Amino acid sequence: NTASVAQLMVSLVLAMAGKLISSSIVLALLPLFCGILLAPSCEAATVDTTSATLLQVKSGFTDPNGVLSGWSPEADVCSWHGVTCLTGEGIVTGLNLSGYGLSGTISPAIAGLVSVESIDLSSNSLTGAIPPELGTMKSLKTLLLHSNLLTGAIPPELGGLKNLKLLRIGNNPLRGEIPPELGDCSELETIGMAYCQLIGAIPHQIGNLKQLQQLALDNNTLTGGLPEQLAGCANLRVLSVADNKLDGVIPSSIGGLSSLQSLNLANNQFSGVIPPEIGNLSGLTYLNLLGNRLTGGIPEELNRLSQLQVVDLSKNNLSGEISAISASQLKNLKYLVLSENLLEGTIPEGLCNGDGNGNGNSSLENLFLAGNDLGGSIDALLSCTSLKSIDVSNNSLTGEIPPAIDRLPGLVNLALHNNSFAGVLPPQIGNLSNLEVLSLYHNGLTGGIPPEIGRLQRLKLLFLYENEMTGAIPDEMTNCSSLEEVDFFGNHFHGPIPASIGNLKNLAVLQLRQNDLTGPIPASLGECRSLQALALADNRLSGELPESFGRLAELSVVTLYNNSLEGALPESMFELKNLTVINFSHNRFTGAVVPLLGSSSLTVLALTNNSFSGVIPAAVARSTGMVRLQLAGNRLAGAIPAELGDLTELKILDLSNNNFSGDIPPELSNCSRLTHLNLDGNSLTGAVPPWLGGLRSLGELDLSSNALTGGIPVELGGCSGLLKLSLSGNRLSGSIPPEIGKLTSLNVLNLQKNGFTGVIPPELRRCNKLYELRLSENSLEGPIPAELGQLPELQVILDLSRNKLSGEIPASLGDLVKLERLNLSSNQLHGQIPPSLLQLTSLHLLNLSDNLLSGGIPGALSAFPAASFAGNGELCGAPLPSCGAPRRLPGAEVSAIVAAIAVVSAAVCVALLYIMLRMWSNWRAVASVSSSDGEETASSVAAAHGKWCAGDGKYWKVGSVSVASSAAEEKYSSASSETTSVLHGKPAEAAGGGAGAVKPASKC
């Protein structure tokens, strides 16, 4: 081989040297021999080294697609996939493995490829750091590592790549700051570091890069301002730093970037005005400043940028009028986006019409002015004849939609919603044959939908909701065969849904809620096979659901509530496997709910107030993502299925007002996200489950009107977020646990109509957000806790009636200044009515009747009717007899006295007759006895008669109300025999009514 030959030649030369020439001459010639003889060997060594380096780089990669399987020492390295060599010389100059699905890391050994000028490892899944060793590759001109999963910081060693022209390392989760050393890469033309996680400021050393043409730093977390030194990048064509946290003002020096074609500063925190120097960027075609905090007006200097095609200044705080910018001067402008600023005034006539003669001479295709405070009409837009998209929504525009709207024949999108347009939808709208989106919602449009709308064969979205439109939905609308979404919510459309609705084969959303539509749901609706959302609620639709409903295989949301639909559900609905939301509440549906349970993806099933019967099928639990299950007000019966415990995402469970029986299933304890549990109005038995206390998200618990027994479990105190607790109308007993006081968020506590005993726990004072407290019709005893006066939000009612409460009314109740109704009737309260109750200025219903109260009624409380105080024998003062007046005897006492008078009178007559017959025979003795009896009796009768007369007179003159005693007795008797609490209102006179008017008693 070559090495052996070389060795032989050297030996031969040395042998000859001993005989012919001196050794010094031989040694001097030896390198020349080596260079000649060993050249092939040196080249082979270089190739071998490059091959070994590449194989070492390969070892760091994972190659699932086997792209690098051909890399082997036996093959020529220049034939390896992705390797580029200098033609004819075998020197590796490029490595391109972009998009090969590689993972793994970049080996530092890659720096051994000293002759490589281009490395492209982009669009793979490489991880790890960028090797700092890359900075030693002096020949490198192109480094593309973008779109990988590289992490760590950008190595500052890259600043040593003096020949580097193209650096793209974006779309990696790189962290840290941009190394200022990159400013030493004097040949750099492109820097791409977008979509990383870089922080810190843009280094001012970037301004040293005189050859830089593109700088892309979008979507990082860079801070600080734009460095003034960027003005040194005289060749910069693209500057994009969008979606960072850059702030400060836009430097006026940016106007010195004379080569700039694209400027994107969007979604930062720049403030101040738009520098007029931007008008010096004569080559600018793209200007995007959206999403900053810019103020001031739109500089007129922008009109000098004749090459501009896109201007987006939206989502700032720009003010003034838009007349500063003229599409007629910016003849290449296609996009003008000024949405969501503070612009005012009107749409200028000269926007697209420079000569003012109504002849448009601009190229403007897309105009977005939404979310400002523009007024006036949109007539000026009619000269922008190139327009394809108009969005002037969310302004204060007025007037009518101009009939000449068809002067914009290329219009594709027309968005006029959220303004104050009036008048009718002009029939000329049907001439816009390219129209795809018509959004007119939330205006004041009247009249009907013109039949000409049926010409819009390309129309996809038709939004007319929240207007005042009337008339029938025209059949011609169903000729718009491209329609995908129709929303007429909140108008006054009447008549039937068009029978030809099935022509809309592409319809995905049909929203007709809150109109006056009548008649049945058309059977042809089943032909709308693309329908995903159907909302027909709040109309006057009637009839049964058509069997064709079962063909709507894509249907996900269907709301039919508040109509007059009836009958059993079609069995075909069981085939609707994509249903997620069903709301059929407030109709007249009957039969079983099984047809609605074909889908296992239900999140809402609301069937409240219908006439569904049977049991809840266990199949309902297949929809494990169910959030709301509302079956209240039906005729469902049987036990609550234990399978409901599988609905672990459930937040609302309302089974109230049905015929369910049995215990509350313990499996419901698995529904840990429940916020509302309503089981009231059934026939449930057993105890209130202690596990309810584990439902930490519970906000409403209503188990009222059942047949539950036992006590209130102390565990309920664990429901710290509970807002409403209602256990009324059961057979519960025992004491009210003090743990109820832990429910500090409670607004409503209703425990009435049970058999609770013991005292009212003073711990209730901790429920300081209570605005309704009902404990009536129990057997509670002891005093009313003064602590109840510490419930400052109590407003709707405090009802403690029909218990066995004793003691005095605590003065602290006067602190309940928001209270509107107070019922303490039918207890054993004694003492005086505390004057502090006069502080209850919001009180309009009061019932203190049937207690043992005494003393005078405090001043302003006299405005309440006498029934509010009845049954308290020692109370006096208006509206009762005044204090100190003779007491009016009850009817029983009057009857007894009358009977006594009659008996005594008869006895006197008999005695007198007896005396006369005796002819004075025993006069002295009889006279003595008769005289004493007679005087006593006569004086008693006279006293009784005077007392009743005086009492009657004073009683019926109290106030200005005169009520017969029998009526009064009947009223009180009625009040005391009622089975529900009765509160008595103030007379109308106190509220401004006529004298003597009395409000009827009200039930709570």
Language model feature labels by segment:
Residues 1-1004:
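Plant-biased, solvent-exposed loop and capping regions
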